[in-house]
Amino acid sequence: MAAAAMNLEPLITRVGEMWTITLAGGVIGLLFGFFAHRSRFCMRSAVIEFARGTREGKLTVWLFTFSTAVLLTQALILAGVMDVREARQLVNRGSLSGAMVGGAMFGAGMILARGCSSRLLVLAAQGNLRALLSGLVFAVTAQSALSGLLSPLRLAISGWWTVEGGSARDLLVITGWGHTGGLLFGAVWLAGALVWGWRQRVRFWGWFGAIGVGVMVAAAWLVTYLISRAAFDLVIPIQSLSFTGPAADTLMLVLSPPGQALKFDLGLVPGVALGAFLSALLWRELKLEGFQGG
């Protein structure tokens, strides 16, 4: 673990901590965008398929990503390669009311907008103008909820039902499964995805790309952890992939004067867009689409 962190020191010395974490976000984002575009990874499609009871392989693609991310993350923790106990999602006080209300709003918006935030970004990168406009509205609304006009409402809702940080937010501790149980949980669902993928004849890039997306989730945990261990001047948060906060941060970077501090999130969003664009370019899938039939 210490050796891995030491290997990052030459890069940190050369470009600095801020650029190192931003470049890490860019590289991971690029690979995520490429794999997400090739696999057609989309939570909305998986939810619709599940609700309709159809078997088109979209839920299986999502399951490949989910199980791979869980399995690899737990394996890295068990191997002693990383420790995510200091991650914001576990350390800070949590809001169950915020998760439920926000989750319901996110799910409804995902269906109405025809894609979650990551899918809208991927679609926009291949020329879908509807997805681009929807993504911009999403980013503006996210920024308003984080620190703008909607933030008092968000804070009020999040205060309805809260839980302490630490073990009170760790499902593996609450259930008593531990990281070994988490590893087995991921392995069982990955095995299920393999069986369903074979039965549904999921194409190569469907399952391979979905696994690649899952690997990027675990890679983000690992890389941010290692850089946080090697950094001296900056406090680097341990995190994985999300798109609500990063979308808002990227929007503010564009609108704010030059000289804003860089971070993982600000490399992630353009990286995803570039990765999806390259995938669409290589497979000749670039196409301008509007609202009519888009």
Identify what each model region corresponds to.
Residues 1-294:
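Membrane-interfacial helix-loop segments of redox and metal-homeostasis proteins
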